[in-house]
């Protein structure tokens, strides 16, 4: 009896297993041919052409089913997607602002010093990084809708957002690595003291054309879209990726690495010669570090892509196992896990890519070259900055037009006039004449005044001499004339004393405003002021002569 009970129990268990397997097989058949798909897959009837469905953004889990993969891709958990999204929004925004600041500084809007091989490379490298970071700003604005227009459809080139971000990302990456190599070449040519002014515009045109060709040929082929394994709109076909990105990217990176070795060798030779040349060595450390930093990041991206391609078959097998798990365990599909790309490495690659904008600002935004550009720009050379900000030590601040200089000179002189008028009301006419001469830079008036003063003094001297000669013949008359002439001389002495007093007061005020006057007086104005000072000295000499007489 005991034996029969065990046998019955075994039969029941086997029967239950068979029933479950039968149900699972039926469910699997339903999934393959019916309108039901396990979570998170979604049912969609095929149109008959897999390529057409793929071009529309629909990716089926299996070739023999109507179940679509979810969007975003199941290779990342929801927590990992949120982590990547948050990192992209924060670092992408900061890097975008940093690259925008440096781009404006080196743009023709602010840079009035012209361009050379070095500044051209910085401007276009920054512009390329700016375009890459701009795709992050677009993503911040649209969110996951930019990647997934629908819950189970991936964005394609037909979607405007994908087209724009795809072009910006592809051109930005290609141009960035091209102009990075250009800066490496510039560093080497600078050390070798080789000039390339005649060919600068040509290599700029050639590099831009290369980047445009590698960007718009995939656009003509309608190759842009969001991959199941990606987080950006980029080239879909793996062959096109190699032709239009990875092959030129690797070649340019190889050329750049050779240039880096040559630069390090040249710097080593310079550092071994003399202490004077060590200053040259130190001046090239910052550009070299920038080139090395970007080289390391580009190299890491290349290594990550090589790792993905090397393990592509393994990752594809894991994806197939995940799909099988979903179909075979429909009631427990949430237990199925997909583990393909290493999330940590993906995070580091995306993070390093977004650090480039911050790095270009740190390495190129705080240099003597950038300081000179700012000091010669309208941002510094304006009345508001002169009035409310302290002038930088050792800086030579210039204005773009003489009119702006004269406005500031008149502003300073008018303030001095007000102070002089308040200190000396009794001599207001003389003070106004002097200030008007300085404000209007009227050299002719000063010369006329000097001539008139000299003429009056000479006349007075002659009259005094005549009176002295005739004093013995006509004492009453001579005394009267000497008294009159003496009054005239006293008046002239007092007038010139007042004139000297006002000149000294103006000089005292001019010393107080020395920072403003030194930074804005043009060469023409300096010459006029020197002539005015000579005239003032002549007036002082005439006054002293009059007193002696």
From Swiss-Prot:
Gene Ontology, cellular component aspect: membrane
Membrane topology note: Multi-pass membrane protein
Chain positions carrying an annotated carbohydrate: 63, 158
Compositional bias per record (Low complexity), positions renumbered to this chain: 417-474, 536-549
Any coiled-coil regions, as ranges: 432-475
Transmembrane regions listed in the UniProt entry: 90-110, 120-140, 163-183, 199-219, 242-262, 288-308, 347-367
Annotated spans, Disordered: 417-483, 528-549
GO annotation (BP), single: cell surface receptor signaling pathway
Gene3D superfamilies xref list: Rhodopsin 7-helix transmembrane proteins (1.20.1070.10)
Keywords: Coiled coil, Glycoprotein, Membrane, Receptor, Signal, Transmembrane, Transmembrane helix
Compartments (UniProt record): Membrane
Residue numbers on the Cytoplasmic membrane side: 111-119, 184-198, 263-287, 368-549
Family in the record: Belongs to the G-protein coupled receptor Fz/Smo family.
Name of this chain's protein: Frizzled/smoothened-like sans CRD protein A
Organism: Dictyostelium discoideum (Social amoeba)
Lineage start: Eukaryota, Amoebozoa, Evosea, Eumycetozoa, Dictyostelia
């Amino acid at each position: 009896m005991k034996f029969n009970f065990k046998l019955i129990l075994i039969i029941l268990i086997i029967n239950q297993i068979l029933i479950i397997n039968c149900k699972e097989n039926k469910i699997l058949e339903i999934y393959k041919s019916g309108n039901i798909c396990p979570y998170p897959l979604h049912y969609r009837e095929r149109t008959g052409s897999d390529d057409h469905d793929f071009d529309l953004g629909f990716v089926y889990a299996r070739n023999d089913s109507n179940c679509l993969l979810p969007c975003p891709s199941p290779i990342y958990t929801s927590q990992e997607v949120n982590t990547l999204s948050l990192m992209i929004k924060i670092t992408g925004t900061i890097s975008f602002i940093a690259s925008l600041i440096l781009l404006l500084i080196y743009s023709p809007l602010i840079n009035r010093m012209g361009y050379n091989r070095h500044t051209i490379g910085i401007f276009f490298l920054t512009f390329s990084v700016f375009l890459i970071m701009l795709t992050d700003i677009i993503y911040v604005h649209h969110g996951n809708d930019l990647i997934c227009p629908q819950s189970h459809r991936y964005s394609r080139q037909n979607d405007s957002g994908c087209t724009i971000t795809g072009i910006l990302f592809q051109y930005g990456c290609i141009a960035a690595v091209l102009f990075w190599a250009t800066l490496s070449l510039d560093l080497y040519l600078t050390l070798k003291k080789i000039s390339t002014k005649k060919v600068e515009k040509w290599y700029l045109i050639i590099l831009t054309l290369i980047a445009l060709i590698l960007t718009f040929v995939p656009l003509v082929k309608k190759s842009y879209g969001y991959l199941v394994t990606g987080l950006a709109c980029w080239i879909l076909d793996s062959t096109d990726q190699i032709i239009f990105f990875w092959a030129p990217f690797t070649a340019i990176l190889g050329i750049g690495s050779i240039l880096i070795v040559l630069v390090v060798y040249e710097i080593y030779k310079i550092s071994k010669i003399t202490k004077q040349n060590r200053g040259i060595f130190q001046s090239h450390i910052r550009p070299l570090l920038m080139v090395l930093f970007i080289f390391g990041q580009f190299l890491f991206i290349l290594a990550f892509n090589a790792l993905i391609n090397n393990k592509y078959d393994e990752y594809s097998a894991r994806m197939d196992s995940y799909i099988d798990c979903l179909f075979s365990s429909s009631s427990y599909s949430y237990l199925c896990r997909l583990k393909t790309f290493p999330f940590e490495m993906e995070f580091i690659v995306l993070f390093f890519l977004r650090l480039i904008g911050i790095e270009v600002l740190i390495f190129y935004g705080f240099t003597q070259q950038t300081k000179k550009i700012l000091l010669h720009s309208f941002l510094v050379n304006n009345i508001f900055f002169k009035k409310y900000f302290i002038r930088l030590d050792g800086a030579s601040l210039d204005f773009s037009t003489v009119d702006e200089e004269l406005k500031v000179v008149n502003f300073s002189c008018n303030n001095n006039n007000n102070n002089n008028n308040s200190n000396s009301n009794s001599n207001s006419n003389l003070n106004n004449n002097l200030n008007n001469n300085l404000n209007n830079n009227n050299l002719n008036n000063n010369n006329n005044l000097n001539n008139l003063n000299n003429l009056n003094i000479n006349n007075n001297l002659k009259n005094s001499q005549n009176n002295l000669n005739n004093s013995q013949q006509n004492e009453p008359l001579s005394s009267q004339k000497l008294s009159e002439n003496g009054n005239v001389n006293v008046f002239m002495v007092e007038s010139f004393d007042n004139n000297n007093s006002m000149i000294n007061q103006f000089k005292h005020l001019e010393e107080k405003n020395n920072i403003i006057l030194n930074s804005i007086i043009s060469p023409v104005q300096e010459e006029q002021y020197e002539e005015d000072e000579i005239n003032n000295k002549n007036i002082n000499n005439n006054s002293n002569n009059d007193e002696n007489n």
